[in-house]
Regions:
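Sensor-1/coupling segment of RecA-like P-loop NTPase cores
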Residues: 1-25
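Short secondary-structure boundary elements
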Residues: 25-226, 237
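Alpha-helical repeat scaffolds
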Residues: 249-250
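Short, structurally constrained coil/turn elements
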Residues: 17-20, 121, 228
């Protein structure tokens, strides 16, 4: 078995673009078309359309794989396209994948530096799309593939950079969950214990109790050495939110 960044991945993906292969342009499938294709399966057609962007190849490959993660054929195609791009552009893709489904322009610039040209090249290369005041991957599966291909060290480093950049560009109450996520992925215990409980309280105040429970649970994963009284506060918060969302078995 070969790794996600093995050179053979490029070869496998390039086979689909060989001059000896007849290429046909297919427009994205509509949500209705995806629903028809997914009929009789356990797939949520709306979620499938969101993840694939309606890309016919992605849709059919995901359905054929039966929900067993991202199909290798999709991974090969995405990684082959990324491998052909300059290293500066690949760095942009790595950062955008870690930032999430949507990467604000100023945040992305903070993480990768003032590489405006590299961001534009990522768009020209068909990997990113301009969206509002930032960028998004053309397909969520492409973002997840790039994210999965990162080494553990690279991923942690980028999450730390994103966390630092979020603090630098300024955040508000609605960013607490995002900060908590990147703090956890960066392994920053102090930041998790600062942001996750605050994110839980914010979610609870908005009636998002399941999200609140998840944030308390996130904090508790880093609370082993916390002062007993502070840990009790987290446990009580989690218990209350779990009760309201019928998750007491957890």
């Amino acid at each position: 078995e070969i790794g996600l960044r093995h050179p053979l991945r490029v070869v496998l993906g390039d086979l689909a673009t060989s001059p000896t292969v007849r290429r046909m342009h297919l427009p994205p499938l509509s949500e209705s078309a995806v629903r028809t294709l997914a009929a009789g399966t356990d797939f949520d057609p709306v979620e499938l359309h969101r993840q694939t962007g309606g890309n016919p190849f992605f849709v059919t490959e995901v359905l054929a794989a039966g929900g067993q993660g991202i199909p290798l054929t999709v991974r090969d195609a995405v990684l082959a396209r990324a491998a052909r791009l300059p290293s500066a552009v690949r760095a942009v893709l790595d950062a955008a994948a870690v930032i999430g489904a949507y990467a604000e322009t100023d945040l992305l610039s903070q993480v990768v530096g003032a590489e405006v040209g590299a961001v534009e090249d990522a768009v020209a290369g068909g990997m990113l799309l301009p969206k509002d005041n930032g960028y998004a991957f053309r397909h969520e599966l492409a973002r997840q593939t790039i994210l999965d291909a990162l080494s553990p060290t690279r991923r942690v480093t980028l999450h730390r950079a994103v966390l630092q950049a979020l603090r630098a560009v300024g955040t508000g109450p609605d960013d607490l969950a995002r900060l908590a996520h990147h703090a956890e992925e960066a392994g920053d215990r102090e930041a998790v214990l600062a942001y996750a409980p605050a994110a839980a309280r914010r979610a609870s105040s908005l009636g998002a109790r399941r999200e609140a429970a998840a944030q308390y649970e996130r904090a508790l994963r880093f609370a082993e050495d916390l002062d007993p009284l502070e840990r009790v506060v987290l446990l009580e918060g989690f218990a209350l939110e779990a009760y309201h969302t019928d998750q007491m078995e957890r």
